[in-house]
UniProtKB/Swiss-Prot annotation:
Involved in the synthesis of tocotrienol (vitamin E). Catalyzes the condensation of homogentisate and geranylgeranyl diphosphate to form 2-methyl-6-geranylgeranylbenzoquinol. Possesses low activity with phytyl diphosphate as substrate. Tocotrienols functions to limit lipid peroxidation during seed germination. The lineage of its organism: Eukaryota, Viridiplantae, Streptophyta, Embryophyta, Tracheophyta. GO terms for biological process: vitamin E biosynthetic process. Residues 1-81 form a transit peptide. Seeds of most monocots are enriched in tocotrienols and contain only small amounts of tocopherols. Keywords: Chloroplast, Membrane, Plastid, Transferase, Transit peptide, Transmembrane, Transmembrane helix. Its main location: plastid. The chain crosses the membrane at residues 114-134, 146-166, 190-210, 217-237, 244-264, 282-302, 325-345, 348-368, 380-400. The gene is HGGT. It is an enzyme of class 2 (transferase). This is Homogentisate geranylgeranyltransferase, chloroplastic.
Length: 404
């Protein structure tokens, strides 16, 4: 009996700690449930004070793995979309580049026509030829002489662009009839673009002239500016191109007098620092170019007779008729070539005499031969003949240095 009581007591004592431990476990589970309910955590399989922290870390890792799975699932789609966007951008850039490649040559071609290239070539050849006249020996060909020549040439080219550009700005309606291929008349350049080009050319020309500190060069530039503006600008007492005499006088004075005397003085007096003493070559060039410039001034109006007549420009071609003006120009040139042959024959240098006599004789013969097949009523033919006269103009400057 006593043994039974002792066994029962031992069992009770063993059950009490187990019950107590169970009670503690239940309380911890309850507190853990409340904590998880409050903070959204999940109880792990083990207890302890780090269970909450470990549970939160586990959730973060689970979220990271979930995001990675979503990325892996959507990455092919994203890559396809990125490739599509990149492809569209590449095609857009390629299209823009092709458009630019097409537009740049067109704009350059329009600018080339805007500058009136036959006048540009005349300026380059004329100034180059006249700048060589003061040179007496190879010792004169220095870097200073080259720099002075480049100052004269660059400023003159800019002034040339100003003059021809200003004329186009004021002749847009006339050029739509006479010269529809010009960029302002055809619409390739806007009026604003033309104005910017004209103003920029003027500023550059004057700036180069001022920087050179050459009185002859500045004089030539300012006179060219005044005469070029008076020729084209439609204002009271201006627009001299309406009058045949004033129009011819503007072209003659610039092409014949200014180019020969001013640029000769610039090279001899300002660059080479020598006293101004005109030579036989520069006197001959001035007189001969007076004839040639008069012909250019008269002949250029023959192809433009329709537009000039329509807009009230009283050119000599409008007043006398194109055929009479045509033969007047031919006779003036032939007379000038005859005088040039006599001037060349008076040279004491045999080589120079041969070059000037035969050179001018050959040019006169070419002019006469082509003039016999005239078709004044054909605008394309008369325009082509006008360009031929400019070629004779260029050729003359190659002969002028041999007239000594």
């Amino acid at each position: 009996m006593q043994a039974s009581s002792a066994a029962a007591a031992a069992a009770c004592s063993a059950i009490k700690p187990a019950a107590h431990q169970h009670t503690v476990q239940v309380q911890e589970d309850k507190r853990g449930s409340e904590f998880r309910a409050r903070f959204g955590t999940r109880k792990l399989s083990w207890g302890g004070k780090l269970s909450v922290e470990n549970s939160a870390l586990h959730q973060c890792q689970s979220l990271t793995r979930s995001i990675r799975r979503q990325k892996r699932q959507h990455s092919p789609v994203l890559q396809v979309r990125c490739y599509a966007i990149a492809g569209d951008q590449h095609e857009s850039i390629a299209t823009e580049f092709e458009e630019i490649c097409k537009e740049v040559p067109q704009k350059l071609g329009a600018f080339y026509r805007f500058c009136r290239p036959h006048t540009i070539f005349g300026t380059i050849i004329g100034i180059t030829s006249v700048s060589l006249l003061p040179m007496r020996s190879l010792d004169d060909f220095t870097m200073k002489a080259l720099w002075g020549f480049l100052e004269a040439l660059s400023s003159s080219l800019c002034m040339n662009i100003y003059v021809v550009g200003l004329n186009q700005l004021y002749d847009i309606q006339i050029d739509k009839v006479n010269k529809p291929s010009l960029p302002l008349a055809s619409g390739e350049f806007s009026v604003a673009t033309g104005a910017v080009l004209v103003l920029t050319s003027l500023i550059m020309s004057i700036a180069i002239g001022i920087r050179s500190k050459s009185a002859p060069l500045l004089c030539a530039l300012f006179i060219s500016f005044f005469l070029g503006s008076a020729y084209s600008v439609d204002a009271p007492l201006l627009r001299w191109k309406r009058n045949a005499f004033l129009a011819a006088s503007c072209i003659l004075f610039v092409r014949a007098v200014l180019v020969q005397l001013a640029f000769f003085a610039h090279m001899q007096q300002h660059v080479l620092k020598r006293p101004l003493a005109p030579t036989k070559s520069v006197v001959f060039a001035t007189l001969f170019m007076c004839c040639f410039s008069s012909v250019i001034a008269l002949f250029k109006d023959i192809p433009d007779i329709d537009g000039d007549r329509h807009f009230g420009v009283e050119s000599l071609s409008v007043r006398l008729g194109p055929e009479r003006v045509y033969w007047l120009c031919i006779n003036i040139l032939l007379t000038a070539y005859g005088a040039a042959i006599l001037a060349g024959a008076s040279s004491t240098n045999l080589c120079q005499m041969i070059i000037t006599v035969f050179g001018h004789g050959l040019l006169a013969f070419a002019l006469w031969q082509r003039a016999q097949h005239c078709d004044v009523e054909n605008k394309a033919w008369i325009t082509s003949f006008y360009m031929f006269i400019w070629k004779l103009f260029y050729a003359e400057y190659f002969l002028i240095p041999f007239v000594q």
